[in-house]
Amino acid sequence: MGLFKSWKKQEVQEKAAFSPVSGELVPLETVSDAVFAEKSLGDGVAVIPTDGSLYAPADGTIVALFPTGHALGIKTRDGVELLIHIGIDTVALNGKGFTVHVKQDDTVKKGQLLVNFDIEVLKGAGYDTVTMMLVSNGEQFGEVHKAPPGTVTAGEKIVWL
């Protein structure tokens, strides 16, 4: 009687990403940089950090790492491509205030420390510290679901597909 086996609902494995920083989760549309706010690089979330530690939002591989330490890309084990960008226009700091703990092509585990950044250095230089996490290949997975605005802790689920 295998006839009805095909009627069983196939369980779809949820693909999730967790907050890379602790702070205040805000809608991506509210950030001051139009490239992010208009989702030109992908849909996602923004967090105003309360401390300067950035952690891996999922298990995966570092596929892009800017030498300045302000941005990196991770491809998760599930094939989700995440772009994490610390601050607005912080590339201009040329790495000042950033300490990177990983290299390109490193395999990382969810919760692993990736970058330390000095919030006071960023703010003192006049930069917004809001940290964006984007799903750059979201079209492959459908809708990007996001946690509601509010206080989040690094490691808390904030995006799922």
Regions from the PLM with identified roles:
Residues 1-161:
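Contiguous, well-folded functional domains in the mature portion of proteins
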